[in-house]
Every structure is written in C-alpha cells, then in structure tokens.
C-alpha cells in the first residue's frame, strides 16, 4: 500500500520549459514548453515527493527518440502507443500555459466516460461545476448522451457549462431542490466531479 509522508511536493499536471537536453535527445530542444514534466529529481531536504512536478525542476523524455533507439521505460507499459499516448508533450506555439495544463485532465475526462460506458443514448448526471465538470459535460455530449444534467452551486459556472456543453439542465443545489427537480428521472451514469461522499450517496438514488 502506497503511503504519503508529509510535507510532500505535488504536481503531475504542469507545464515546464526545457533548459537542458541530453546528447541523444533529437526531438526536443531548450526553450520548448512541455506538458506534465515528471518530478523525478531529488526534492529539497525534509520533503518527500508525490509526483513532484512542482519541485521547481523536473524531467521529461524524448519518447520518440527513445522508441527509435530501442530504449525501454516502465512508463511505456501503461501505454498502447508510447509516442502517441505519453502525457508529456511539446506544447504548440500559440497555446497558453493554462490551456496546456488542462490537456491531461481533458484526456482523463474522456477516458473516464468511455470506461463508464457512456455512449449514444446515455443519460448522464454530473455533480460539480468546475473545469472537470465542464470537460465531462462536453465529452458526454460528444459521445452521444441524450441527456446531460449538471448540478453545482455557482450560477456563473453553471451558465458557462450550459453555454459551452449545451447540456439539457443545470441545477444550483444551493437554491433548488435536486430531489424535487429530478423527481422520477433516472440516469445511466452519475459522476461526482466535486469529491464528496454525500454527493455519491445522493447521486446513487438517480441511477437506473
């Protein structure tokens, strides 16, 4: 069982600028921005490392060069295609750092919905109104969900989700009764994008 000893350095969804490259690196260069550099360097004394991308300095890999040279990495075993699927990628010119940071989260949103079995005709209930809930809402619609309902408690965020994801219904749980508004409705999938045991119990009532 993995345990975390505090204080620890977090960070696995970050952005970094390459300062130095090794002699066998061919497809990355100093000055390139990359997503998700890995915190594989020794942290400051007194700290442990949990992903550690916020360590100030981190590492990335020239995966294409490694594959061409026959170099293996334990990380590759988790990927169908190391070159296409490796999370640390060069950021295109013109893409902002905040947008680049969201790329890994968006991939996880899409993967989660696929794993949950969301498909054309699904009914999806999402609790949360932050960036993750927005991504889930967009991808649920993209996958063909016939009903996407979002429950949150920030009117401006819910309005943004309604505008961008074209969801069927948004509810503010602070001012509206979720049970009353959704009475009699059932959903194939319920996703807690806020992180609350109470939400899990509440959402389970609406599952088919």
Predicted ranges, named:
Residues 44, 68, 134, 200-201:
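Glycine/Thr-rich phosphate-binding loops of Rossmann-like dinucleotide-binding domains
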Residues 13, 32-33, 57, 123, ...:
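Residue-level marker of beta-strand positions
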Residues 207-208:
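Helix-to-beta-strand junctions that scaffold the AdoMet/dcAdoMet cofactor pocket
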Residues 1-43, 48-54, 61-64:
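Glycine-rich beta-strand-centered segment in the early N-terminal region that forms part
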Residues 11, 133-134:
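N-terminal Rossmann-fold NAD(P) dinucleotide-binding loop
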Residues 38, 104, 194:
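Glycine-rich, N-terminal phosphate-binding loop of Rossmann-like dinucleotide-binding domains
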Residues 89, 126-129, 137-202:
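Adenosine-nucleotide cofactor-binding segment
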